[in-house]
From Swiss-Prot:
SMART domains, A to Z: MUTSac, MUTSd
Protein name (database record): DNA mismatch repair protein MutS
UniProt function note: This protein is involved in the repair of mismatches in DNA. It is possible that it carries out the mismatch recognition step. This protein has a weak ATPase activity.
Organism encoding this protein: Synechocystis sp. (strain ATCC 27184 / PCC 6803 / Kazusa)
Domain of life of the source: Bacteria
Record: residues binding ATP: 656-663
NCBIfam families per the UniProt record, alphabetical: mutS1 (TIGR01070), PRK05399.1 (NF003810)
Length: 878
C-alpha cells in the first residue's frame, strides 16, 4: 500500500489488489478480494450479470491463457481502472475446462439469489463459491475424458518408503498401496497418469497447484515432472487424522477389511486424499467406493519405458491414440468398457485362473456370433453407469443424467436374459442383476419426462399423475395462460381496435399495446404504463392480478418439481453401490465381447497359459497393430521359441539389416505376451506361454535434455534397471545395446549384458544387435541361439523378406540403407572402401571365438585399444 496511490488507467490498470487500500474499492471489488483471499491458489471467476468476470492478476493470466482481450473496469474513485476479462455464463464450462487442462485450479463464484430481489432491496447480490475445479477433482462429463480415468493421487513419504492413494471421483474408484524405492513410485505414477498429485509439505505456499514442469524444492527429484502437483498441509496426512477420516467415511471400526491396517503410509495417503476431496467439493458429498489395497507385484510389472516402447495406449512418435495397442483392440460399445480395457492393458494379470476366466468368456463369445452381436447391440444402449452414479450421489446430476441412468437400468434385464445363454464366468456374473435395480429404473421413468430440460429449476421435469398438487397447479396455470391467450381477441372485440396486441417484457410484465393514433380509444380501465414513439402500453387491474398469479404459480410449480426431482435423485443415490457393482460387470463383458470381435476378424488364437516358468512358444506370431495398419495378408508372420528348460534357447541373438523388422519383431513378442496375460486372444496360429512377472524393453533412445543425460547415458540407465530387476520369470527385449558409444566399448558392454542375462538371470531374452560378433556367444553358452531377419540380395538392391530364421547375419546392409535414403554416390563409394578396411583389420571375432569367455573381453579390448589409433589412420587414409 502506498501513501499516494497511483490510479489505474485504461492502458495501465491495477493488476495486484494486495498493494491497494481495499477500503477504497467498490463494494463488489471488496467482496471479490475477500473471496480471492480464501482461494489464492485458484483463478477466481466471479458472476456479474450474464458474465463470469475476473480481475487483477487473474484477469492477466486468463486473458493470456484463453487468448481473450484484457480490458479494465472502474474499481473505485481512488483506485482507478482494474484489469478485467470475462467469459459469457453459457460458455463457462468450455473456458473453465481449458484452464483446468492447462493445470490451473478454478473457483466459480456464482450468484446464489435472484438479482432482481437484491436490486429491489438496493443491496449487492449475494455470491458464493459454488465449485472449485482442479485437474483431479472434475465430475462434469463435458470436462472429462470419456475413455480414460481422471485420477487424483496423493503421496505420503518417509525417506525412501512411500504410500500412494489414487481415486477417480467421477466413478468413485479408490485405491491405495505402499512400497519402498522412489523409482517404483515414479513408475506407478506414470502408469496411472494422474491429473493431479497431492504432496504434503510444510511450505508456506500450500494450496498452490504446480503446473507440469514447474519446479519446486518440495517435489522429490525422482518424481516425474509431467504432472500437476498440489502442495497440501501436513495435518490431514498425519496417521491419526488420516485413519480416523477413513474409519468415519466408510463407517467401519477397523481398516483390516480394506487390507491396509498395517500399512501406515498407504493410510496416510488415502486419508489426505479424502480430505482434499472434501475441501474442494464444498457442499457436494462425493460417493467414494470402499478403499481397496493392492501391491505393485499383484500384476505383471510394466515400467514406463516398456509401456512407452510397446505403445500400449499412445504412439512413441506423436503420442496419438491411433496406432497404439489400445487402438487396435478397442471394440468396446460403452465408455465404461473402454476405460476398463485401458486399465487391463496397463495391469495384465499374474493369476492363471483370472486369465483363463477371461479367455473362457472370449472363447464362448467367439464361437457364438449371434450372442456376441446381440450383446454388443444392447451394450450400445447403456449409458456410463459409473459416472452417472457419481454425479447422482454428489447431487450434481441433471434430470437428463437420472433419466439416462434409469433407461440403462431397465435394459439390464434384457442383458441378463441374454447372458442366460452363457456358461463362462463373466456371462454368469451378468445373470444375477439385482431385480431392485430394474424396479428403480421403472420408478424413475414413471416420474421424469422423457426429454427433460438441462436445468433442474426451470420446470417441465415431472410427469403428470405423479403428484396431485402438482397436477392442480399445472391446471390452474394452464387456465391462466389460456386467459392470456384469449385476452388479445376479447379486448379487440371490446375496443374495436384491430391492431391491439398483448405483450410482455421483464421490466413491466404483461401489457396491452395500442398504436398512438388509437390511444384516445383506450377504455377507462386501461392504465398507461409506457409511451413509445409509435405505441402506448397499458395495464388493467385484472391483467395485473393474472400476471401476479401466473408468475407466482410458475415459481411455485418449478419449486415443487425441483423438490420431487431431488427426492427421486436421492432414491437413486441410495442404490449407488449395487449400481456400481453391476457397472463393473457390464464394463467387463463389454471388454471381452470387443476382444472376441477382434479375435474373430483378425484371426487370433487362444494361447495356452501355464504357471510353469520359462516358456514362450509362438507359432506364426504377428504384430497386432502393424498387421491392422498394413491390411489383411501383408504382414509376415514369424515363430518364437524361448525357454532352455523346454529345449529352446533362453536368449536369442537377433541380427539383420537396418529397417528389416527387428524392432517390430521384438515389440510383437512383447505385445503377444502382454495380451495373453490380459486374457485376450493373440495374433498367432498357436501359442503356449508361461506367465511372466515383468516385461522389459529397451528399444531406441534419445537424449534426455531435461536431466542433462546423453543418449548413451539414458541407454545405460535403462539397461541397468533391467539387469537389477529382471528375474528368471521375466521377458527382456533389447535393441541395439551399446551403440551410443565407441564401437569397442559398445561391443564389450553388449557382450557382457547378453552374457549376464543368459548366464546369471536366465530370463527369456531377445537381443537385437548389429554387433555380429555377438553370434559367437551361441558357441559358448548352450542356452543362446542365433537368429536373423533375412533379405534377398539383387545386383542393384536388397529386398527385405521380414522372415526370422535360424543363423546369424554377417552384414547389416547399413550402406545399402544409406543409398536407399539418398546419400550422395561419392559418400556411398567411400563408405564401402572404409568398410573393407574395417573388416580386414578387425580380429575381434577371432579373439572371442578362441578366448575364455570370462577373460576374452578384457584382453581383446586392451589389444584393440592399443591398436586403435594406428587403425584409424589407416582406415581414413592419413
Amino acid at each position: 500500500m502506498t501513501d499516494t496511490p497511483i490510479l489505474g488507467t485504461v492502458k495501465e490498470p491495477q493488476r495486484d489488489y494486495r498493494t491497494l487500500d481495499r477500503q477504497k474499492l467498490t463494494p463488489m471489488f471488496q467482496h471479490y478480494t475477500e473471496v480471492k483471499e480464501q482461494y489464492q491458489g485458484a483463478l477466481l471467476l466471479y458472476r456479474v450479470g450474464d458474465f463470469f468476470e475476473c480481475f487483477f492478476q487473474d484477469a492477466v493470466i486468463i486473458a493470456r491463457e484463453l487468448e481473450l482481450i484484457l480490458t479494465s473496469k472502474e474499481g473505485g474513485k481512488e483506485i482507478g481502472r482494474v484489469a478485467m476479462t470475462g467469459v459469457p455464463h453459457h460458455a463457462l464450462d468450455r473456458y473453465a475446462r481449458q484452464l483446468v487442462e492447462k493445470g490451473y485450479a478454478v473457483a466459480i463464484c456464482d450468484q446464489v439469489e435472484d438479482a432482481a430481489e437484491a436490486q429491489a432491496e438496493k443491496r449487492m447480490v449475494e455470491r458464493q463459491v459454488t465449485k472449485l475445479l482442479t485437474p483431479g477433482t472434475l465430475t462434469d462429463d463435458s470436462m472429462l475424458p470419456a475413455k480414460r480415468n481422471n485420477f487424483l493421487a496423493a503421496i505420503a513419504m518417509v525417506e525412501d518408503k512411500w504410500g500412494l492413494a489414487h481415486a477417480d471421483i467421477s466413478t468413485g474408484e479408490f485405491f491405495t498401496c505402499q512400497s519402498s524405492n522412489l523409482d517404483d513410485l515414479a513408475v506407478e505414477l506414470l502408469r496411472l497418469q494422474p491429473s493431479e498429485v497431492l504432496i504434503p509439505t510444510s511450505a508456506p505456499d500450500i494450496r498452490n497447484i504446480l503446473r507440469p514442469g514447474e519446479p519446486s524444492e518440495h517435489i522429490p527429484k525422482q518424481l516425474p515432472t509431467s504432472f500437476c502437483y498440489s502442495l497440501r498441509s501436513q495435518a490431514p496426512f498425519s496417521l491419526v487424522e488420516a485413519k480416523q477420516r477413513l474409519l468415519t467415511t466408510f463407517r467401519v471400526k477397523s481398516l483390516e477389511g480394506m487390507g491396509c491396517e498395517g500399512l501406515p503410509l498407504a493410510i496416510r495417503a488415502a486419508g489426505g486424499l479424502l480430505e482434499y476431496i472434501e475441501d474442494t467439493q464444498k457442499a457436494h458429498v462425493v460417493p467414494i467406493q470402499p478403499l481397496k489395497t493392492y501391491g505393485l507385484t499383484d500384476f505383471l510389472v510394466l515400467d514406463h519405458q516398456t509401456r512407452r516402447n510397446l505403445e500400449i495406449n499412445q504412439t512413441v512418435r506423436d503420442g496419438s491414440f491411433h496406432g497404439s495397442l489400445l487402438w487396435a483392440l478397442d471394440r468396446t460399445s460403452t465408455t465404461m468398457g473402454s476405460r476398463a480395457l485401458r486399465r487391463w492393458l496397463l495391469q495384465p494379470l499374474l493369476d492363471l485362473k483370472g486369465i483363463q476366466a477371461r479367455q473362457d468368456t472370449i472363447q464362448e463369445l467367439y464361437h457364438h456370433p449371434a450372442l456376441r452381436q446381440d450383446l454388443r447391440q444392447l451394450l450400445r444402449q447403456i449409458y456410463d453407469l459409473e459416472r452417472l452414479t457419481g454425479r447422482i450421489g454428489a447431487n450434481t446430476a441433471s434430470a437428463r443424467d437420472v433419466y439416462g441412468l434409469a433407461s440403462s437400468l431397465v435394459r439390464l434385464t434384457d442383458l441378463a436374459e441374454l447372458a442366460q445363454e452363457g456358461h463362462s464366468p463373466y456371462l454368469k456374473a451378468l445373470q444375477t442383476v439385482p431385480p431392485e435395480l430394474e424396479e428403480l429404473g421403472k420408478y424413475v421413468l414413471a416420474h421424469i419426462v422423457e426429454n427433460p430440460p438441462l436445468h433442474i429449476r426451470e420446470g417441465n421435469l415431472i410427469r403428470s399423475g405423479v403428484n396431485p398438487t402438482l397436477d392442480e397447479m399445472r391446471q390452474s396455470l394452464e387456465d391462466d395462460n389460456q386467459w392470456l391467450a384469449n385476452l388479445e381477441v376479447t379486448e379487440r372485440e371490446k375496443t374495436g381496435i384491430a391492431n391491439l396486441k398483448v405483450g410482455y417484457n421483464k421490466a413491466f410484465g404483461y401489457y396491452l399495446s395500442l398504436p398512438r393514433s388509437k390511444s384516445e380509444q383506450a377504455p377507462d380501465n386501461y392504465i398507461r404504463k409506457q409511451t413509445l414513439v409509435n405505441e402506448e402500453r397499458y395495464i388493467t387491474p385484472e391483467l395485473k392480478e393474472r400476471e401476479t398469479r401466473i408468475l407466482t404459480a410458475q415459481a411455485d410449480l418449478n419449486q415443487l418439481e425441483y423438490e420431487i426431482f431431488t427426492e427421486v435423485r436421492a432414491t437413486v443415490a441410495e442404490k449407488a453401490q449395487p449400481i456400481r457393482d453391476v457397472a463393473k460387470a457390464v464394463a467387463a463383458i463389454d471388454v471381452l465381447a470387443g476382444l472376441a470381435e477382434v479375435a474373430v476378424y483378425q484371426g487370433y488364437c487362444r494361447p495356452i497359459m501355464q504357471m510353469e516358468p520359462g516358456l514362450i512358444d509362438i507359432e506364426a506370431g504377428r504384430h497386432p497393430v502393424v498387421e491392422q495398419s498394413l491390411g489383411a495378408g501383408f504382414f509376415v508372420a514369424n515363430d518364437t521359441q524361448l525357454g532352455h528348460d523346454h529345449w529352446h534357447p533362453d536368449l536369442v541373438i537377433l541380427t539383420g539389416p537396418n529397417a528389416s523388422g527387428k524392432s517390430c519383431y521384438l515389440r510383437q513378442v512383447g505385445l503377444i505376451q502382454l495380451m495373453a496375460q490380459t486374457g485376450s486372444f493373440i495374433p498367432a496360429k498357436t501359442a503356449t506361454l508361461s506367465i511372466c512377472d515383468r516385461i522389459f524393453t529397451r528399444v531406441g533412445a534419445v537424449d534426455d535434455l531435461a536431466t542433462g543425460q546423453s543418449t548413451f547415458m539414458v541407454e545405460m540407465n535403462e539397461t541397468a534397471n533391467i539387469l537389477n530387476h529382471a528375474t528368471a520369470k521375466s521377458l527382456v527385449l533389447l535393441d541395439e545395446i551399446g551403440r551410443g558409444t565407441a564401437t569397442f566399448d559398445g561391443l564389450a558392454i553388449a557382450w557382457s549384458v547378453a552374457e549376464y542375462l543368459a548366464g546369471e538371470i536366465q530370463a527369456r531374452t531377445i537381443f537385437a544387435t548389429h554387433y555380429h560378433e555377438l553370434n559367437e556367444l551361441a558357441s559358448l553358452l548352450e542356452n543362446v541361439a542365433n537368429f536373423q531377419v533375412t533379405v534377398k540380395e539383387l545386383p542393384e538392391e536388397i529386398i527385405f523378406l521380414h522372415q526370422v530364421t535360424p543363423g546369424g547375419a554377417d552384414k547389416s546392409y547399413g550402406i545399402e540403407a544409406g543409398r536407399l535414403a539418398g546419400l550422395p554416390s561419392s559418400v556411398i563409394t567411400r563408405a564401402r572402401q572404409v568398410m573393407a578396411q574395417i573388416e580386414k583389420h578387425s580380429k575381434i571375432a577371432v579373439g572371442l571365438r578362441k578366448g575364455n569367455r570370462g577373460k576374452v573381453m578384457a584382453s581383446q579390448a586392451a589389444a584393440e585399444a592399443a591398436e586403435d589409433q594406428a587403425k584409424q589412420l589407416d582406415i581414413f587414409g592419413f
